[in-house]
Amino acid sequence: MEGKNQTNISEFLLLGFSSWQQQQVLLFALFLCLYLTGLFGNLLILLAIGSDHCLHTPMYFFLANLSLVDLCLPSATVPKMLLNIQTQTQTISYPGCLAQMYFCMMFANMDNFLLTVMAYDRYVAICHPLHYSTIMALRLCASLVAAPWVIAILNPLLHTLMMAHLHFCSDNVIHHFFCDINSLLPLSCSDTSLNQLSVLATVGLIFVVPSVCILVSYILIVSAVMKVPSAQGKLKAFSTCGSHLALVILFYGAITGVYMSPLSNHSTEKDSAASVIFMVVAPVLNPFIYSLRNNELKGTLKKTLSRPGAVAHACNPSTLGGRGGWIMRSGDRDHPG
C-alpha cells in the first residue's frame, strides 16, 4: 500500500462497454431508447397525478415520488455514458466521479425505500380496507416519504466523504459504465477495509431489511387474497401483485449480486449487467407495472393531454400544494388493485 506512488488523480476512465467495439452504435441506440422511454413514462405519470386532484391520494402520492426518483436515477448515469459512446471519450473528472457516485447511491436508496412504502400501502389497502383512510393519514404518509429522503441524502454523503479521504495511485481505469463505489475502492492505495465494511452494512440495513419487509407484506397480502371468495377477484389481485413482486425481485436480486458479494468475486461483465437492471431497466418498467396499467390513471392522462395548458397546470406547485391537495382525501376513492 504505502510503497505505491500516490498521485493526485484528476480524472478517471470509464471503460463501460468499450469491449463491445462492434456494437457501440447498437448500445447507443438501445440505452437512448430505454432512457427516453423511462423519461417519457415517468413524466406522464407526474403530469397525470399533478393535474387531477382526484389522484391526490396516498397511493398516487407514493407513485409520484417513485416517478420522480425514476427520472433521476438513470439520469445520473445514462447521459454521461451516451456522451462517452458518441464522442469516443471515456474520461470523467474526479469531482464528477464522486458526484455521480453520490447521486446514484442516493436515488437507488430512495427507490428502494419507496418500493417498501408502496408494498406497505398495498398491504393496508388489501388487508385493512375499512381502516385504510385512518391508517394512511396525512402525517404518516408524509413521514413515510420524508424520513427515507433524509436517509437517502445522508447515507451516500457519508460514503462520498469517506471516499474523498482515500488516496489513489496511477491506476485510474474504472471497469464500469459509471462511478460505482465497488469499482472505485480497488483503485485506492489506502486501506479500504472500513469502506467495504460500511458498504456491506449499508446494503444490510438499507436494502436487506426493506426487502424482508416487502416479502412479509406480500405474504400477508397473499394470505388475505386467498380468503376472497370470488375467483375473478383473486386472479386480478394475483396478477397485479405478481407483476409488482417480479419487479421487486429483479431490483433486489441485481443489487444483492453487485453489493453483497466480496470485491474479489466481482466480475466486470456481471456487475455492469446487474447495474443496468436496477439503474436503467427497473426505472423504465416501473411506470408500466405500477401506473400505466391502471385504467384510472390512463383515463386521467387522456383527459389531461387533450386539455390546453395541461402541462403548465400540472407543473404549477399550487396544483400539488393547495388545501385539500395531497393525501387529504385518502378515503375518497377506492385503492386500485
From Swiss-Prot:
Coiled coil: none
Transmembrane segments: 26-49, 58-79, 101-120, 140-158, 197-219, 237-259, 273-292
One Pfam family from the record: 7tm_4
Subcellular location: Cell membrane
GO terms assigned for molecular function: G protein-coupled receptor activity; olfactory receptor activity
Membrane topology: Multi-pass membrane protein
UniProt keyword annotation of Metal-binding present: no
Record-linked Gene3D superfamilies: Rhodopsin 7-helix transmembrane proteins
GO cellular component, one term: plasma membrane
Extracellular-side segments: 1-25, 80-100, 159-196, 260-272
Gene Ontology BP annotations: signal transduction
Superkingdom classification of source: Eukaryota
Disulfide-bonded cysteines: 97-189
Glycosylation sites (chain numbering): 5, 8, 265
Cytoplasmic-facing ranges: 50-57, 121-139, 220-236, 293-337
Main location: membrane
Keywords carried by this UniProt record: Cell membrane, Disulfide bond, G-protein coupled receptor, Glycoprotein, Membrane, Olfaction, Receptor, Sensory transduction, Transducer, Transmembrane, Transmembrane helix
Keyword presence, RNA-binding: no
Biological role: Odorant receptor.
Family the UniProt entry places it in: Belongs to the G-protein coupled receptor 1 family.
Protein name in UniProt: Putative olfactory receptor 1F12P
Organism lineage: Eukaryota, Metazoa, Chordata, Craniata, Vertebrata
